[in-house]
Curated annotation (Swiss-Prot):
Pfam family name, one: HTH_ParB
Gene: noc
Organism domain of life: Bacteria
Localization per record: Cytoplasm, Nucleoid
Name the UniProt record assigns to this protein: Nucleoid occlusion protein
GO molecular function, one term: DNA binding
């Protein structure tokens, strides 16, 4: 984790570049400086405000608690002091902390670090991303938060995480879907591929309607994609079809260039709405960009 974190912190603390070296040293010492480990009261520790995980499996927490009860805590949690004296905020190790609570232990071994909000958020986000246990929506929110914290492009973020840019872009597109669809992914009522199939519909009311149909009829991904195609065809059929003139070569090139540019804007994470209408003498392209 050290390599990924140092690269992020180097970008995230632009006013104090020397912090990159200091933080690398702190992370490297994590497992070696045993004198830093302290026994902290469990009830003095609060969850990480930047924790990307919103759902914790009670079964997994119980399994971890059983392991801890048998073998103890092998790796201490990491915390930072809060403004309230004697209180701490988790940086890493929330599952261990929750497991210890179920065991009703009074204290837990911890390492105290002096991290900023940006550093704390980055540790929490990257630690969870590397565990690959997040839902698609939680992962998407983690990517969005890292982009915001470190002022990165999607391409730069993908490089730093060792992932393909398309992987990051596809996850971020999920955040453009209505809240109902995102919640269905979190609750595992539909898969990520189901959700991605809904993106071309664009209109939230159509996406929600098909979501309900997927759940009620238990449609698989292929069936969902077929329904999307039909819904798009029906949407097109409702529009009046003007008499068409043949497109000139220059017009085709211009439209293709505009469409490619719009795709690039969408891939950057900006949600835009577009609508094309053909008239007898011209093509009208309406673009709505949020402020």
């Amino acid at each position: 984790m050290k390599h990924s974190l140092s690269r992020f912190f180097g970008l995230g603390d632009k006013e104090h570049p020397e912090r990159e070296t200091e933080i690398e040293a702190e992370i490297a010492e994590h497992d070696t400086l045993k004198e830093e480990i302290q026994e902290l009261p469990v009830d003095t520790i609060m969850p990480n405000r930047f924790q990307p995980r919103t759902i914790f499996s009670e079964e997994k927490i119980h399994e971890l608690a059983t392991t801890i009860h048998t073998h103890g805590i092998i790796q201490p949690i990491v915390v930072r002091p809060t403004e309230e004296e004697g209180k701490y905020e988790l940086i890493a190790g929330e599952r261990r902390w929750r497991a210890v609570q179920t065991l009703q232990w009074e204290k837990i071994p911890a390492i105290i670090k002096d991290f900023t909000d940006t550093e704390t958020a980055s540790v929490a986000l990257i630690e969870n991303l590397q565990r690959e246990e997040l839902s698609a929506i939680e992962e998407a929110h983690a990517y969005a938060r890292l982009l915001e914290l470190h002022d990165l492009t999607q391409e730069a973020l993908a490089q730093r995480l060792g992932k393909g840019q398309s992987t990051v872009a596809n996850k971020l597109r999920l955040l453009k879907l209505p809240e109902e669809v995102q919640q269905a992914i979190l609750e595992k009522k539909i898969s990520e591929r189901h959700a991605r199939s809904l993106v071309p519909l664009k209109l939230p009311e159509l996406q929600i309607a098909l979501l309900q149909e997927i759940i009620e009829k238990q449609l698989n991904v292929k069936q969902t994609e077929e329904r999307v195609v039909k819904m798009l065809e029906q949407k097109t059929d409702r529009k009046p079809r003007p008499k068409r003139k043949a497109f000139s070569r220059d017009t085709r090139i211009a439209m293709n260039t505009i469409r490619q540019s719009l795709h690039m804007v969408e891939d950057s994470g900006l949600k835009i709405n577009t609508e094309e209408e053909e008239f007898e003498e011209y093509i009208q392209l309406t673009i709505r960009i949020p402020k």
